[in-house]
Amino acid sequence: MRNMKIITCLLTITSLVFTACGRGSNDIEKAKSVATTEHLKRYTEAISHDSCQGRKPFSEGAERAVNYIARQMKEVGLKPIDGDSYFQQVNIISSRTRCPDPMVLKTPKGKIPLDWLEGYTAFSARIEPEIDIDNAELVFAGYGIVAPEYGKNDFEGIENPRDKVAVVIVNDPGLGSDNTDYFNGDIMTYYGRWMYKFEEGARQGLKGVLIIHEDRGAGYPWSVVRASAQSKMYVDSDSDAYHCPLNGWIQFNAAKQLLADNGYDIDQLIEQSKSPDFKPISLK
């Protein structure tokens, strides 16, 4: 475990607003003078520069980035949050998940072996030495969404979720639609993001979530998923509270075979999953 200095853009903006409001007009005018389009452009260019190395935790680039942000805070007159410091300490753990190669899915028609990085990727953000998913039951849970404003709950009716791994579709039900009143149409909402699906799986108490990858729905090719799976993961020391034991992705064709072996057509299920009336389907 290591301590890491972090500062977020949200903190910068929030501090600017509340500090400015609580001080004199000169301070407000100073804040206005630096909060310009040109200043934000320079700021964005600076922290996205190659020298910051993607702001990867514990890297020299991340150190450059946070020190730059701290200087910017000082220049615009923001108050430090801890004595004379603009930094806070956060406990961060780096980990790497070793997965079975292949992972085998059991179906009514036999077994489907999925090669690591080619057929699937998986990781665990839990601070545990081993995650056991042997004999976990797979459930097709549509888009993996709980959205009361659209009358949609793709997990409704799942029993004993701690023993289940949900297989869900990337993106949201608005994909390919012109109806902006339903999940914002073809513009992805947060419900369509992979992070949301993993978060919702944890809220539902599931053992795991596997997202069906499809280039158009994800917005990027499988190579991005594969590259990410080979990198170290950085999580905070309380990550067990809001992560499933297992999260991952499977290739579209692998999911297609899995569903076909259970008597379902993947394209038909994708269409059915767009409806608020969709209910999860147990896979044997």
Predicted regions located by residue number:
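C-terminal motif of bacterial Sec signal peptides marking the signal peptidase cleavage site
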Residues: V17-A20
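N-terminal capping segment at the start of a domain
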Residues: E29, V34-E60, V76, D82, ...
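Soluble non-cytosolic domains of exported or imported proteins
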Residues: V34-K41, K56-N67, I81, I133, ...
